């Protein structure tokens, strides 16, 4: 019993954990006397990212996240994030459960971001735009068990698309109204957040613009992604599928689907393909080549991935059909973070 009580206290959610035996001496009842913390821990996380392409396409990001937990007796959380680099952004939100079981919740928040992005025509970078956005949102949703979440909400704000390096006659967007209805579903059974060896991750998003919320462009947008990983001894294999559609509507340039880069489509430059609908499929296998710490699950992996996909109604007017790529991968979980 004492070991179980120690395990419960180690969760970090209680100031004190005591127990007592009561009732019939022959068959006593175990009473746990818990005193919940009136405060919660604060988590701070930093991340550093660097991408260098063979054609001079580079990207650098320094990011930090702050999570303040249990700000009230319902388990409310304050979250803030800051990103610096080619993409610079700031986001702040309040996640507030509405009941003691923490199934129903609301989440208001603010988002502001600016990013320098290259525009490609048939594989060649011909312009660079500075995309910027700022909007607020309000979501409400429900958590299902330990793995699934469904939410819906509204957004309202503005979008910009300014020329940074481009011909003077290329179009620009200045403070265009942005707003609409959103829905999002997430299922997550991964054994860990990064480089997981077992589990399924599913994400699906839907957005429909609404003039009453400030939108100037009339369009719909749906996108989904699923990744399943399967352990193979100390190694693992995974399959990933993703796709998106505008349902025949014309997406504004700031909300086009984008693929290209080491994550979405290895072999393409970051953001090389932009369009109104797409699909991708990927199979990968990673072999453990070095173990750093079995206690913390830290190891180095090497392997490869094969990717196929197609982007339709591309911004450059080209229709290339299905394209393929192969990639060699070196990755891992290290004491300094993911590699």
Task: Show which residues each predicted segment covers.
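Short coil/turn segments at secondary-structure boundaries
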Residues: 151-153, 196-201
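Generic macromolecular interface patches on structured domains
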Residues: 18, 76, 104, 150, ...
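Gram-negative/organellar outer-membrane beta-barrel architecture
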Residues: 3-190, 257-263, 271-275, 279, ...
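Short, contiguous, pocket-lining structural segments
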Residues: 173-177, 192-196, 214-218, 231
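A generic structural micro-feature
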Residues: 56, 130, 175-177, 196, ...
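Outer-membrane beta-barrel translocator/pore domains, especially the C-terminal barrels
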Residues: 190-199, 251
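C-terminal transmembrane beta-barrel domains of outer membrane proteins
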Residues: 33, 63, 79, 93, ...
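Short beta-strands and strand-coil junctions in structured, solvent-facing domains, enriched
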Residues: 15-16, 39, 53, 100-101, ...
């Amino acid at each position: 019993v004492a070991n179980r009580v120690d395990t419960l206290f180690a969760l970090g959610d209680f100031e004190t954990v005591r127990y007592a035996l009561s009732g019939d001496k022959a068959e006593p009842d175990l009473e746990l006397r818990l005193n919940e913390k009136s405060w919660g821990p604060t988590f701070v996380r930093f991340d550093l990212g660097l991408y260098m392409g063979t054609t001079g396409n580079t990207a650098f990001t320094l990011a930090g996240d702050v999570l303040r937990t249990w700000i009230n007796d319902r388990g409310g959380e304050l979250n803030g994030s800051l990103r610096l680099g080619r993409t610079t952004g700031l986001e702040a939100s309040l996640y507030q459960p509405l009941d003691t079981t923490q199934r129903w919740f609301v989440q208001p928040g603010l988002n502001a971001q600016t990013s320098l992005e290259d525009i490609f025509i048939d594989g060649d970078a011909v312009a660079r735009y500075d995309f910027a956005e700022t909007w607020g949102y309000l979501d409400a949703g429900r958590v299902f068990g330990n793995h699934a979440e469904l939410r819906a909400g509204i957004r309202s704000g503005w979008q910009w698309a300014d020329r940074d390096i481009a011909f003077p006659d290329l179009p620009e967007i200045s403070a265009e109204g942005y707003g609409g209805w959103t829905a999002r579903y997430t299922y997550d059974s991964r054994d860990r957040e990064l480089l997981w060896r077992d589990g399924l991750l599913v994400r699906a998003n839907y957005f429909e613009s609404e003039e009453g919320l400030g939108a100037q462009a009339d369009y719909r947008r749906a996108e989904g992604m699923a990744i399943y990983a399967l352990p193979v001894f100390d190694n693992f294999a995974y399959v990933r599928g993703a796709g998106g559609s505008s349902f025949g509507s014309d997406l504004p340039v700031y909300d086009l689907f984008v693929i290209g880069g080491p994550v979405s489509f290895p072999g393409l430059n970051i953001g090389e393909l932009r369009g109104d609908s797409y699909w991708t499929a990927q199979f990968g296998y990673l072999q453990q080549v070095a173990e750093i710490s079995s206690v913390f699950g830290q190891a180095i992996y090497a392997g490869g991935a094969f990717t196929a996909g197609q982007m339709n109604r591309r911004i450059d007017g080209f229709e290339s059909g299905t394209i393929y790529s192969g990639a060699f991968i070196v990755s891992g979980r290290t004491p300094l973070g993911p590699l």
